[in-house]
């Protein structure tokens, strides 16, 4: 992991880039969203595909599909490179409401009127094996702002050999979920 970061710095100093894609919300990179860069990764990679994510607030859901292994997301600064979204997996309450709490329904993936309707229930979903990330904050705004309510995942990693270095994960409940099987190793 440290070797990869050191190599990236050496390439940057030499004037050539080790990255296959650069994401910048301000438009100064190859892509403005992380998902656009993920979509451009060739299927069936057998070596790391490095994506630099410049500092910024990326308000989006990111899904790394199973057919895109070896995706590496590398941020500039974990406090300034933030992938976030406001969503939860709460279902509509019927009958007596629990403590008057129904505000979550507006941001539920089950609500047909919600902007996140039918989204997968996490800010980031990793299905591609050999995923690596560093220097990025993954934040589910629902959990951070509400501090109560239904499940609000920031990260759902279903892949094998996923590595996380110098990252932040923020939400309220069930912030990070991993696959429930014997072949999903995380580092």
Residue ranges and their predicted role:
Residues 38-41, 163, 169, 185-187:
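Glycine-rich phosphate/ribose-binding loops and adjacent secondary-structure elements
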Residues 54, 65, 74-76, 127, ...:
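Feature marks extracellular polysaccharide-active and adherence modules
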Residues 62-65, 85, 122-127, 144-146, ...:
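Glycine-rich beta-solenoid repeat tracts in large extracellular/virion proteins
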Residues 1-16, 93-107:
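Bacterial Sec-dependent N-terminal signal peptides
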Residues 19-52:
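Acidic Gly/Asp/Thr-rich repetitive segments characteristic of extracellular carbohydrate-active
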Residues 56-60, 78-80:
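Short active-site-proximal "capping" loops at secondary-structure junctions
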Residues 23-27, 50, 69-150:
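Right-handed parallel beta-helix/beta-spiral solenoid domain characteristic of secreted/periplasmic
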Residues 32-43, 58-67, 73, 178-179:
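Short, T/G/N/S-enriched strand-turn elements that build extracellular solenoid repeat scaffolds
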């Amino acid at each position: 992991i440290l070797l990869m970061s050191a190599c990236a710095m050496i390439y940057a100093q030499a004037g050539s880039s080790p990255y296959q894609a650069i994401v910048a919300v301000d438009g100064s990179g190859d892509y403005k969203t992380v998902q656009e860069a993920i979509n451009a990764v060739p299927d069936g990679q057998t070596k790391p595909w490095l994506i630099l994510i410049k500092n910024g607030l990326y308000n989006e859901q990111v899904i790394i599909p199973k057919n895109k292994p070896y995706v590496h997301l590398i941020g500039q600064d974990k406090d300034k490179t933030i992938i976030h979204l406001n969503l939860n997996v709460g279902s509509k309450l019927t009958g007596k409401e629990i403590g008057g709490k129904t505000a979550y329904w507006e941001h539920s993936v089950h609500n047909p009127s919600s902007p996140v309707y039918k989204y997968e229930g996490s800010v980031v979903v990793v299905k591609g094996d050999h995923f690596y990330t560093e220097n990025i904050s993954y934040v589910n705004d629902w959990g951070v702002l509400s501090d109560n309510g239904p499940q609000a995942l920031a990260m759902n990693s279903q892949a094998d050999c996923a590595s996380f270095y110098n990252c932040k994960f923020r939400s309220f409940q069930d912030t990070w979920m991993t696959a429930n099987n014997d072949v999903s190793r995380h580092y």
